[in-house]
Amino acid sequence: MTAQNPNLAALSAAGVSVWLDDLSRDRLRSGNLQELIDTKCVVGVTTNPSIFQKAFAEGHAYDSQIAELAARGADVDATIRTVTTDDVRNACDVLTREWENSDGVDGRVSIEVDPRLAGDTDKTIAQAVELWKIVDRPNLFIKIPATQAGLPAITAVLAEGISVNVTLIFSVERYRAVMDAYLAGMEKAREAGHDLSKIHSVASFFVSRVDTEIDKRLEKIGGERALALRGQAGVANARLAYAAYQEVFEGGQRYQALKADGARVQRPLWASTGVKNPDYSDTLYVTELVAPNTVNTMPEKTIDAVADHGVIRGDTVTGTGPDAQRVFDELAAVGVDLPDVFVVLENEGVEKFVDSWTELMEETQKQLGSASK
């Protein structure tokens, strides 16, 4: 058996599931995904519109399937749906062993609803159900954004017995609403007679984008006190989120009642963990966010950085809430408008995915056009 990288093995042993934030047909065909499972402790995959847009734009792995779909008269939406769900289904199959070995906790692959639906609850629910049926794998996660319209969709989709990855969470306040939506969904699933032990969920809390936005504002404010806070907000925010998770799932009565009927915790997932600022350690959002019952989904570059020089020191999150709160108190004191930061980040997050989806549609249209000539 191939040996696992010791740094990533230490991360896994500390309770962090390592997931790959990427997927492409080339990665599946070459056996690279299986190799990462065997050597880099990868036990899950996340995708998003930007990842698929990049996969479509690079190389020719999709050419023959798109030509076949063009010959059948498939439109752009149908083509994207077929191609992306095929990749996700194949990735689910590659990760079946990890899914079985973890009793369904890991071995998960996430596919996102069309980001253009982020403001439409009913259409989000309908597409989530449709994607679940098309992929037809028990280790699938449907990604739903934590927008105001997304929250009731999360509850409704979980109530159908469908596992959900809640994405685009930036603030602890919104994260609390997400946990509430999860518990409401599980209560409804119980009423409907679903086996709660088979319904899983993660809450994807974005990290590096918080630093990018807040650092920009700190530089504008200027002065020693403000500048000293750069690079601290992302980790502090995630640590406060973990404290909220512990409050709800380790001490909360509402969850305990569901747990008695087999419900799992909704694990926090650290997303956007690739470091954007070259002044910071490229493993910052991994080594500083080690905690039991968490997931860290990373681009391959970050996985490689952790494998090469990541120092895993055990749990770096539990008990850090008061220090993290001090960072936020200080940010407010120097004049950072935190509520505005989180509104901007959510809007930008949705816009980025919509832009990627638009590019994906344009690329697909171009390929369908070429194939039908």
Curated annotation (Swiss-Prot):
Described function: Transaldolase is important for the balance of metabolites in the pentose-phosphate pathway.
Signal peptide residues on this chain, from the entry's feature table: none
Name of the featured protein: Transaldolase
Enzyme Commission numbers on file: 2.2.1.2
Residues at the active site: K143
Functional pathway: Carbohydrate degradation; pentose phosphate pathway; D-glyceraldehyde 3-phosphate and beta-D-fructose 6-phosphate from D-ribose 5-phosphate and D-xylulose 5-phosphate (non-oxidative stage): step 2/3
Record family assignment: Belongs to the transaldolase family. Type 2 subfamily.
Subcellular location: Cytoplasm
One GO-annotated biological process of the protein: carbohydrate metabolic process
Protein species of origin: Mycolicibacterium paratuberculosis (strain ATCC BAA-968 / K-10)
Enzyme class: transferase
PROSITE patterns for this protein: TRANSALDOLASE_1 (PS01054), TRANSALDOLASE_2 (PS00958)
Molecular function GO terms recorded: transaldolase activity
GO cellular component: cytoplasm
Reactions mediated catalytically: D-sedoheptulose 7-phosphate + D-glyceraldehyde 3-phosphate = D-erythrose 4-phosphate + beta-D-fructose 6-phosphate
Key words of the record: Cytoplasm, Pentose shunt, Schiff base, Transferase
